[in-house]
Amino acid sequence: MQVIAKIEKWAQLPDVQTQNGMTSKAQVVLRMSGGRNAEGLVGTAFGVVAGKPLAEGTIVVADVRFYTHEYEGKVFQDVNIFDLMPLKSPQQVGEHF
């Protein structure tokens, strides 16, 4: 799912071990357009996306995927961010942020 959102927070996390070595990891808070009460989400970015931090306030097109899994009878949801493309100017999306 692609969304247009503003980066509210970017937290670089410690690198994680993968089958191919180490990879970067970041936790990103995104706020959708729609003003102060707009919906937001917290997702995890890995690899190249996590290795190129973007400034808070940057408006981006984000490729976000949601996964659910069950563990010990409880259902959990993971939000992964696969791509972040900064928009060149805020005028491209209007004044919704």
Stretch-by-stretch model annotation:
Residues 1-97:
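Single-stranded nucleic acid-binding surfaces, predominantly the OB-fold ssDNA-binding core
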